[in-house]
Amino acid sequence: MERRVFGKSLVGGAVAAGIAAGLSTEQAVPQAARTLKPKKNLEMHVGGDYHSIAGGPGADMTAKSNLEYNLRHGVKHLTAQVRKLGPDGAWDADELKRMKDNCDKAGMNFEAIRMDADYIMLRPGSERDRRLEAIIGNIQKASQVGVKVVTHHWTVIPIRRNARQDGRGGVTYAAFKLEENWKDLPVGTAGKVSSDDYWERITTFLHAVIPVCKQYDVRMAAHPYDPPGLPFGYQGAENWDSPSIFEGYKKYEAIVDSPYNGFQLCLGTTAEGLRNPATEVIPIVQYLAGRGKVHQIHMRNIKGGLNNFAEVYPDEGEMDFLKIMRILRDSPFNMSICPDHMPTHSEDPGRLQAYAFGYGYIKALIHAVNSEV
């Protein structure tokens, strides 16, 4: 508790002042905030999710085959999507109970649910109001089956990739390079969304939803838009994590400063918005994890950085995940660390092999950092 108060009063103010003074993100985070006392963290764990499903995309995530696939690779915590939806995106309570029962029978913890991004597409009006009411109801239903986290990825334009690169062992890496003619790209289906419009939607969402999350003990975890740092106006959007991913995180969590308002901290996405991911990602993780605002980790590595990158295996990119895992170990973080966006291969079309590697890599990192203390 004392650490969180310290983070709010001193770290937040110092970081804001440092950034305003033109310091780098690393310079702006006080040394005290970068020196958490080493301690074992036996609560953080590897997690499985919707990126890799035995049976293929769209298959039942709580079917015996998928649960056993995860359990075989040491995964005991699941983030699932709800396929059966009612009006305005309402989750079916019976479907949630079925998923929970399947997980319980298999020895799997039904830890989190990824909700859709439909809300963020909507302008103020009755349709958006109905969607918010459905989300509030979904939080209550999630609580009833013991789910602790609801994740979401606000995408007024789709995730952007426009290139492929060859990788080790014949795999293919998804990649992105900012187009020279990006101003000529078509506007997304949501139409033009200004920064003010975007933040109005986020603010309305957080003020309506976070008090309900607190009431039902369900944490809301926002995934940064992928990729961050796109120039304003890219496909008509002025994304919340542009032009600065770090500033976006701080602004987002400050709207409703609550332990229930946090992030699905995608390390790969965060790195995509940085010129020097190896060094610049560290103070971001320190800041968010030290404040208890990380409710899930996506552990993905990249080669490159801002506006020019490729998604690679976790052991070959710009970031040193051992350093990041030490920060998580010493912080209040106690949720899932999930592999994310693994490379593809013709002999592994569902990427089950690739994600199995990711699960083992994460488990080894957790063991390694806890063995140090």
Range-by-range predicted roles:
Residues G47-D49, A54-G55, P87-D88, S126-E127, ...:
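A generic structural signal for short
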Residues Q81-T203, H207, K214-Q215, T269, ...:
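Structural motif corresponding to the early beta-alpha repeats
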Residues R34-T62:
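Boundary/entry segment of secreted carbohydrate-active catalytic domains
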Residues Y50-A54, K84, D116-Y119, W154-P158, ...:
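Active-site-proximal loop/turn and secondary-structure-junction residues that shape catalytic pockets
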Residues A54-N70, L132-I139, E280-Y287:
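Short, acidic/polar
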